[in-house]
Amino acid sequence: MKTLFDKTNLGTINMKNRFLRGALWTALADEKGHMTNELSDVYEELARGGVGTIVTGYAFVTENEQPNPRMMGIYDDSFIPEYKEFTDKIHRLGSNIIMQIVYGGFMTEFNVGERVIWGPSTTKNEVTGTLSREMTKEDIKYLVNAYAEAALRVKKSGFDGVEIHGGHGYLVSQFLSPYYNKRTDEYGGSIENRGRFVFEIFKAIREKVGEKFPILIKLNSSDYVKEGGLTIEDSLYVAERLAELGIDAIEVTGGNESIEEVMKDNLGPSRTKVAISKDRESYFKEYAIKLAERTNKPVILSGGNRHFDVMEELLNDTNIEYFSLSRPLTAEPDLINKWYSGDLKKPKCKSCNQCYKTYGKRCIFNIK
């Protein structure tokens, strides 16, 4: 019988347990995206709390496109020394750390003004109103290279891997979704074409970082829109193609935060009312189960993971190997240590999402 505290290997990463802290923007970097003591403290507390691997909040890959205020940056080499010092601290505390990288596209809300915001097509974010301009092929080439250069900096900074953000309405998922991608060239239309952007990003990163450095993707299972969005079958195609290309792991997510209908129907990535009953937990599990059956790459399940026994049952009854938690570890950074000690109570997190409204994205029940 497999357990959630098995020691395993994810690519070249030695995992002390099957738990990851999923990416969460904390808004604690400085205005240019550089590390602060406050931000480092958040990750150090998580590492002391026992989680095997931490994925950072997303880091932006080009200086002129910071999607949200005080998010981490990785757009030039000035970040490498401070991140090397940071990753050394996390490793000394016993955790691995992976950096998630992103280009926001029309998910950008910060200092938009007259800036040109790129997207697969000229379109508008239904939730924020941010407009994007259709990218030229030269723009696409530039961004593919920006992702690759950022990933190389991630490696030089001592991170254990890099994760491409391919969900929630950010640029990669905009390309994947026919809801927003209306292109008529080789980057639009069929799922083979809509996937071309992320396939090129992956191949460019692999060429920069080498064969052994772990590359992951956080991939939308579906937009969960009634009509015209990314479907589960299309997403499975993208995941399988990335597996063929050599991706090291796929973190499953879903929901498009830029589509008003999705957010209104509570079908985004951070759903509320998860704590009502066990059958509302792990809400992307059906897709993750299918994906784990169709690829030999490790599948990481995110989204509403709460009860220890539910996750352990999924571990043993399916091919899902790892479990990502964000909001529960915001409420209880030492949750994994509690579980390891035998205290298997469900997390205190109520999935109310009020943490997203606080300074530093802190649980409102912990603020004194």
Predicted regions: what they are:
Residues 1-368:
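Flavin-dependent oxidoreductase catalytic cores
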